[in-house]
Amino acid sequence: MNYFVSSFLEIKNTSRGLGVFTKIDICAEVIVEHSPFSSCWSAKWEDTPENLRKVVFSHPQNSDNYVIGLGYTAIYNHNDNNNAIWLTSDDGIYIKTLKNINAGEEIFIHYGDAYWSGGWPKY
C-alpha cells in the first residue's frame, strides 16, 4: 500500500484541541490522506471505552466493529458543515475533500450520528 499524509497538511492547536489544517489551497475531490488502521474489535458503541470513542472508525466490512486510524485520522475535528469526508476500505482510511479549502483553513470531517449519541459535547 502507498500510505501517505500530504505534506501540505499541518497540525495546529484549536479551541477544540488539535486540528488538521492545510498550508495550500486544495480543490474539492482530493484525497489528502491514506492511512492504515489497526486494533479491530467488536462492541456496542455504548460499551466502547470513552478514551477510544474519540479515535475510532467503523470497520469497512462490518459497522459493528471498530478500528483505530493511524496517521492524522484521529486529529480531524467535527463540523456539521464539513469540508472533507472519511472513507474506509480494506486497505485503510482515506480523507477526501468535499469542497475547495483555502490555505490556512482547518479541514473538518463529520463524525456521524453514532458519535453524538455517545454523550460527547457537540461543537
Residues covered by each model-derived region:
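Conserved catalytic SET/PR domain of SAM-dependent protein methyltransferases, capturing the structural core
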Residues: 1-123
